[in-house]
From Swiss-Prot:
Name of the gene encoding the protein in the UniProt record: atpA
Catalytic reactions of this protein: ATP + H2O + 4 H(+)(in) = ADP + phosphate + 5 H(+)(out)
GO cellular component: chloroplast thylakoid membrane; proton-transporting ATP synthase complex
Annotated positions for site Required for activity: 363
Record protein name field: ATP synthase subunit alpha, chloroplastic
Family: Belongs to the ATPase alpha/beta chains family.
Lineage, highest ranks first: Eukaryota, Viridiplantae, Streptophyta, Coleochaetophyceae, Coleochaetales
Residues reported in the UniProt entry to bind ATP: 170-177
Length: 512
């Protein structure tokens, strides 16, 4: 047996005493009184804060929303089927936050930023609060750069700028999602990070959008945040804030971002469900009193940052669904008053074959021509006026039997201009192609064609310019201006191609 000297023992004990650290941890614990419908009532937790995350015995996470005198009302972020009455709940001392990194690009995640596309974990070293404060007045600058959507009707008449919030509003099945997804497709090569937030959508619809993005190579710069219709209301309520937090991560790094919220009506319904189950007093249309704040604090996070903060931007395109075209309902009026303009999609236009079904008369952009390149301003000025006059004349001409020649000509021009605005889904146009198309219409080059020939003529004209008059495209692209030289080249192309097109049509007629 080894002899141990007493002083060795005492020195070991002394070292251990020195290393001993009496750490006191206070854990705030409560007891579940009642649970069901995604809501838990908890007794205790007297030090809990509003919005704090709670952890239940089975690992489910909840958010404390109602702090009452004798209990706490919490919403569950999950099914919570194994939570029982009497089980304990612990306050975590944290509020909802998500991991963020460049690794999220090309991935599909849920409202807690966890991947749901089966491609493994996403590495992230940084965290952002799901609900963070919007940039202040001093942190912003006015919107001045265009955010091209690739849709002629929008880019020419309802222009959107980087940092703007533009509402897309219309009945179901009028092409709202198509306008938003086309805008994402058009950002290819523009160094814009896109976030598509699907709230309460059918999983099949989200899969279709994902498929389109993958086919067109748009997932390289896009993140999809999805909480389908079968998700708990809490997660549907959180999804838009998660999308905004992911976009903010890139915005504060000086990047340009675009966020689509599809759609905020579903988020408001999820929030209404949570509020009614928490027994908060209902207001108009049974929505809680703070439903305006729900959307305003989300949309105010979209901004164009000043040069000290890196000139990044977040452009928001919220979507709201109306019932039978009623724009004066509660949620539509709220979101219209928060945003910088709205694009109104009409079911009547959609059904009559005008797609995208944008009602140019009541759609508006409050940023206006500040968000257009000079070339677009030069050619698009006449377009909105001529279309407005045409709409007025068309309504009037239904009652008049004999119209004078000038009126007939104006109606004919209007019909061709309306045809010019039609575009197929998932085929956004570059801005130089849009300039050529609008110039062709407003300067009467389509007047000699029948309405049925217009779209075919324009598609082939754009191909002709690309292959034979590429100098025009280069001038508009590099100078962002419709110069005299560009106009001269375009006029030549129009004269040459119109003759060619009419000769081809004549040849086909004689063949048939």
């Amino acid at each position: 047996m080894v002899n141990i000297r007493p002083e060795e023992i005492s020195s070991i004990i002394r070292k251990q005493i020195e290393q001993y650290n009496q750490e006191v941890r206070v854990i705030n614990i409560g007891t579940v009184l009642q649970v069901g419908d995604g809501i838990a009532r908890i007794y205790g937790l007297d030090k809990v804060m509003s919005g704090e995350l709670l952890e239940f015995e089975d690992g489910t996470i909840g958010i404390a929303l109602n702090l009452e005198s004798d209990n706490v009302g919490a919403v569950l972020m999950g099914e919570g089927l194994s939570i029982q009455e009497g089980s304990s709940v612990k306050a975590t001392g944290k509020i909802a936050q998500i991991p963020v990194s460049d690794g999220y690009l090309g991935r599909v995640v849920n409202a807690l930023a966890r991947p749901i596309d089966g491609k493994g974990d996403i590495p992230a070293s940084e965290f952002r609060l799901i609900e963070s404060a919007a940039p202040g007045i001093i942190s912003r600058r006015s919107v001045y750069e265009p955010m091209q959507t690739g849709l002629i009707a929008i880019d020419a008449m309802i222009p959107i700028g980087r940092g703007q919030r533009e509402l897309i509003i219309g009945d179901r099945q009028t092409g709202k999602t198509a306008v938003a997804t086309d805008t994402i497709l058009n950002q290819k090569g523009n160094n814009v990070i896109c976030v598509y937030v699907a709230i309460g959508q059918k999983a099949s619809s989200v899969a279709q959008v994902l498929n389109t993005f993958e086919e067109r190579g748009a997932m390289d710069y896009t993140i999809i945040v999805s909480e389908p219709a079968n998700s708990p209301a809490t997660l549907q309520y959180l999804a838009p804030y998660t999308g905004a937090a992911l976009a903010e991560f890139f915005m504060y790094k000086g990047r340009h971002t675009l966020v689509i919220y599809d759609d905020l009506s579903k988020q408001a319904q999820a929030y209404r469900q949570m509020s009614l189950l928490l027994r908060r007093p209902p207001g108009r249309e049974a929505y809680p009193g703070d439903v305006f704040y729900l959307h305003s604090r989300l949309l105010e996070r979209a901004a164009k940052l000043n040069s000290q903060l890196g000139e990044g931007s977040m452009t928001a395109l919220p979507i709201v669904e109306t019932q039978a075209g009623d724009v004066s309902a509660y949620i539509p009026t709220n979101v219209i008053s928060i945003t910088d303009g709205q694009i109104f999609l009409s079911a009547d236009l959609f059904n009559s074959g005008i797609r995208p079904a944008i009602n140019v008369g009541i759609s508006v952009s409050r940023v206006g021509s500040a968000a257009q390149i000079k070339a677009m301003k030069q050619v698009a000025g006449k377009l909105k006026l001529e279309l407005a006059q045409f709409a007025e004349l068309e309504a009037f001409s239904q009652f008049a039997s004999d119209l004078d020649k000038a009126t007939q000509n104006q109606l004919a021009r209007g019909q061709r201009l309306r045809e010019l605005l039609k575009q197929s889904q998932s085929s956004p146009l570059a801005v130089e192609d849009q300039v050529a198309t609008i110039y062709t219409g407003v300067n009467g080059y389509l007047d000699i064609l029948s309405v049925g020939q217009v779209r075919r003529f324009l598609v082939q004209l754009r191909e002709y310019i690309a292959s034979n008059k590429s100098e025009f495209t280069e001038i508009v692209k590099s100078t962002k201006t419709f110069t005299d030289k560009a106009e001269k080249i375009l006029k030549e192309a129009l004269q040459e191609y119109t003759e060619l097109f009419l000769a081809q049509e004549e040849l086909e007629k004689t063949k048939s």
